[in-house]
């Protein structure tokens, strides 16, 4: 890969690294500052902090896997990170929205992968709610993954589709 092509991609990768570092730092803070099961209210009726250990996948699903489940999710996350990187390096320079989405996805995947490989679980601590509805506890990596996925979905529906020419009539 030539120097110019790598230089502009480095900015996106640097952004991903920055988000990854914010995720890891925020989780380290949560471990030190929050007690398991204790809730700290930041914005009454909207935002709380509550330490949780997620041994499953999104929203705490599939937590019964034990050691097999831990390493299965590590391998799955590693495969997802590799897939995002391949897609990232195949995306044209002009496609900023997709490149940004890949950066967000990569940061989030690697943030949760690091926890799972190192600890056997993912540290979650952000709890949003409105009235009686509570969103499942999440972290910066989860928010990054959701933002990246939404950006990709937006791009999918906003990108112009190539027009297939209609068959010519031969009558």
Which sequence ranges carry the predicted segments?
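Alpha-helical transmembrane bundles and membrane-interface segments of multipass inner-membrane proteins
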Residues: 1-171
């Amino acid at each position: 890969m030539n120097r110019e092509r790598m230089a502009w991609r480095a900015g996106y990768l640097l952004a991903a690294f920055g988000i990854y570092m914010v995720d890891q730092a925020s989780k380290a803070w949560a471990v030190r500052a929050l007690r398991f099961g204790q809730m700290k209210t930041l914005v009454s009726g909207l935002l709380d902090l509550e330490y949780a250990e997620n041994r499953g996948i999104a929203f705490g699903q599939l937590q019964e896997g034990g050691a097999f489940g831990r390493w299965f999710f590590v391998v799955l996350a590693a495969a997802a990170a590799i897939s995002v990187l391949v897609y990232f390096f195949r995306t044209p320079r002009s496609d900023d929205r997709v490149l940004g989405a890949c950066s967000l996805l990569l940061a989030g995947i690697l943030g949760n992968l690091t926890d799972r490989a190192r600890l056997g679980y993912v540290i979650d601590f952000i709890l949003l709610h409105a009235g009686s509805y509570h969103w499942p506890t999440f972290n910066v990596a989860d928010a990054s993954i959701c933002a990246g996925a939404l950006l990709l979905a937006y791009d999918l529906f906003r990108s112009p589709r190539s027009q297939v020419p209609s068959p010519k009539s031969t009558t």
